[in-house]
Amino acid sequence: MDPVDPNLEPWNHPGSQPRTPCNKCHCKKCCYHCPVCFLNKGLGISYGRKKRRQRRGPPQGGQAHQVPIPKQPSSQPRGDPTGPKEQKKKVESEAETDP
């Protein structure tokens, strides 16, 4: 390892800065450009402020794409409308007449 001038700050050491500035390209070469590019572009880790996404407003024209939903009739109980009690009585009466 080459000796480094002790009076030089660490961020000014030779080889500490890449020769070209960082850019917004995400190609393989630019992802490995420097440690910061690798973290941000290669791994997707960013410690900066997160941008707030703006909500999209409703499209002009209001209800152009909305179809009204028809009212459904209230649900009715399924099965025999006479009810379970009358069925039990029928079964009991049939059981008495069989023997």
UniProtKB/Swiss-Prot annotation:
Motif Nuclear localization signal, RNA-binding (TAR), and protein transduction, chain ranges: 49-57
One record GO biological process: positive regulation of viral transcription
Cross-link annotation Glycyl lysine isopeptide (Lys-Gly) (interchain with G-Cter in ubiquitin), location: K71
Post-translational modification: Asymmetrical arginine methylation by host PRMT6 seems to diminish the transactivation capacity of Tat and affects the interaction with host CCNT1. Acetylation by EP300, CREBBP, GCN5L2/GCN5 and PCAF regulates the transactivation activity of Tat. EP300-mediated acetylation of Lys-50 promotes dissociation of Tat from the TAR RNA through the competitive binding to PCAF's bromodomain. In addition, the non-acetylated Tat's N-terminus can also interact with PCAF. PCAF-mediated acetylation of Lys-28 enhances Tat's binding to CCNT1. Lys-50 is deacetylated by SIRT1.
Region (Core): 38-48
Region annotated Interaction with human CREBBP, chain positions: 1-24
Xref: InterPro entries: IV_Tat (IPR001831), Tat_dom_sf (IPR036963)
Region (Cysteine-rich): 22-37
Residue list for modification N6-acetyllysine: K28, K50, K51
Other observations noted: HIV-1 lineages are divided in three main groups, M (for Major), O (for Outlier), and N (for New, or Non-M, Non-O). The vast majority of strains found worldwide belong to the group M. Group O seems to be endemic to and largely confined to Cameroon and neighboring countries in West Central Africa, where these viruses represent a small minority of HIV-1 strains. The group N is represented by a limited number of isolates from Cameroonian persons. The group M is further subdivided in 9 clades or subtypes (A to D, F to H, J and K).
Function: Transcriptional activator that increases RNA Pol II processivity, thereby increasing the level of full-length viral transcripts. Recognizes a hairpin structure at the 5'-LTR of the nascent viral mRNAs referred to as the transactivation responsive RNA element (TAR) and recruits the cyclin T1-CDK9 complex (P-TEFb complex) that will in turn hyperphosphorylate the RNA polymerase II to allow efficient elongation. The CDK9 component of P-TEFb and other Tat-activated kinases hyperphosphorylate the C-terminus of RNA Pol II that becomes stabilized and much more processive.
Family (UniProt): Belongs to the lentiviruses Tat family.
Name of this chain's protein: Protein Tat
Organism: Human immunodeficiency virus type 1 group M subtype D (isolate ELI) (HIV-1)
Lineage: Viruses, Riboviria, Pararnavirae, Artverviricota, Revtraviricetes
